[in-house]
Structures are given as structure tokens and as C-alpha cells.
Amino acid sequence: MTARSEARKFFVGGNWKCNGSVSQVNELVSMLNQCSLTSDTEVVVCPSQVYLQGVKDKLRSDVAVGAQDVWMKGNGAFTGETSADMLTDMGVQWAVVGHSERREKGESNEEVAAKAKFAVDKGLSVMACCGEPQANREAGTTNDFVFPQIKAYADVFTKEDWAKVVIAYEPIWAIGTGLTASPEQAQDTHKDIRQYLAQVAGAEVAESTRILYGGSANAKNAPELSAKPDIDGFLVGGASLKPEFADIINCQTTLKSLKPVNVGINGFGRIGR
């Protein structure tokens, strides 16, 4: 099997979703600050918007902070929204766009792409999500559902924009369910996405853009998934709230000494997905 391109630095994002309290977030930041993390992996954590500044102020400098969503326009009379200008003002570097838990509230492919483009134009990098429901997986029509999501991104991004984009493939049926795409299923879909990206954005973009897997990724399945040539990292949900997140970050390293230290906490226990 062809090895994963070394030009695509391994990437692990942690989506904390709507979880935590001030004390729990502080514990999680403390845990990350005390872990031995390989420098071979780019790491981003995405706390709830209300905790962004606190996490940014306390988190180690080699772990970036991202938002879980971003508004598609600038500042103004948009109650409840968070603009890219606000995020960059507080030093946030990344934003997730197009997560299925946002799309299920009615966001179209075009609206998601507009968010992504506006964020990139304002200086943010984005984790651009895509993924299919179980019905499409079972019907063998995964690409029919996912490719239009990719096309919407390709329609708005310039070639230069793609340097600030990672794609996160998250099969909807595997998010928060405990189900996980097999390494072969995930690799096949990632390969299909990369080949389609070459068609709509060019071969250079397809080769250089990182494609993450999300959907019940954890410390147990991460090593086998990460061995596949088109899987360039993970967007992690529930497991990012636990000490095993460090093992996921380190799953590419052969240095057995890189282990999370025992800091006496169990993450956020059973909350979250």
C-alpha cells in the first residue's frame, strides 16, 4: 500500500462540543499541558465559544485553539453569532465549519461554504466537514452525498485558500454512536474524496490537502486508521475530553516514551458524544 505523503503533516483536532464547566475545562487544559505530545502532529482543540478565551490564555503554545462554528458575515446585527473578526481578535486560529450537528439545523452546502470562505478571507484556518447518513452508506451512495459538499467548498476557495483548509470526513452514522468505519471503509472514502478533489480543485490541491477521519475515533482504533495512506489525522469528539486524547495525538510516533502522564482525572466522564 502507498504510504501517506510526508508533505501532509498529521493533524488531530479535538471538538469538545457543548460540554464542560469552568472547572472541567481547566482540568482538561491542565491535562493537555502536562502530556508529552509529539511535535510531528498538528493539534487543535475546539472548546465551546464561552470558554475560548480562557483556554487560549492557559493552553500550551504548541496546541492551537479553534471555534466550533463561525458566522458567514462580519460584525453587525446578528444576534447569537460569532464573527471571524471576533475570533481572530482573541487569537483563535481555527474554526470548524459544516459539522453534521450544524447541518441538521438547516445549513445548506452553500451556506457552509460561505462560512468557510469568509473565515479564510479573515485569516482563520478551517476544518471543513463532510459526511453521509447511514442510509447512503447502506445504499452505496456515499459519494453522491459527500461530493456535493466538497464541490461547494471547491466553488468558493482559490488555490491559495486551500493551504488554510483541512477536510474532515465524518460519517454521520458514526458520530457519537460508538460505530466506526472500518479502516478499509474510511480509506476508500478518503481516497475517493482526494480523487474528486483533484477533479474540482486540481491535482496539487488534492495531494497537499489533509483529510481527517471523524466518527468515534479513539485511542484504540486510531493507530490502524492512521496507517492508511489517505487518512491524515482525526477530528475527535468524545475521546478529546479524556486523557486518551494524548494517545490519539501520539498514535503516529514510534517513541514509546511519549505517553500521557497520570494527572489523576478521568476527563469529563460520560458526558458528551
Enumerate the predicted regions with their spans:
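Active-site loop-to-helix "anion-binding N-cap" substructures in soluble metabolic enzymes
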Residues: T2-S257
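Glycine-rich adenosine-cofactor-binding loop
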Residues: V261-R273
